[in-house]
Amino acid sequence: MAVQKSKKSRSMRGMRRSHDALTTAALSVDATSGETHLRHNVTAEGFYRGKKVINK
């Protein structure tokens, strides 16, 4: 097993963990259908930027 050469301080532990935070998804509401969707993604009904791009 690997063994550290010296103890890491609380400060170094915190600096390492500073990048571990989770972010919420960026959601948008489509202008045409009023449906909530992820940014830069087609809605479930096939709309993108107010236009129908996928026919079901």
UniProtKB/Swiss-Prot annotation:
The keyword Chaperone does not apply. Keywords: Ribonucleoprotein, Ribosomal protein. One of its GO terms (biological process) is translation. Residues 1-21 are annotated as: Disordered. InterPro entries: Ribosomal_bL32, Ribosomal_bL32_bact, Ribosomal_zn-bd. The keyword Ribonucleoprotein applies. Residues 1-16 have a biased composition (Basic residues). GO terms for molecular function: structural constituent of ribosome. It comes from the Bacteria. GO terms for cellular component: large ribosomal subunit. HAMAP family: Ribosomal_bL32. Belongs to the bacterial ribosomal protein bL32 family. This is Large ribosomal subunit protein bL32. The lineage of its organism: Bacteria, Pseudomonadati, Pseudomonadota, Gammaproteobacteria, Vibrionales.
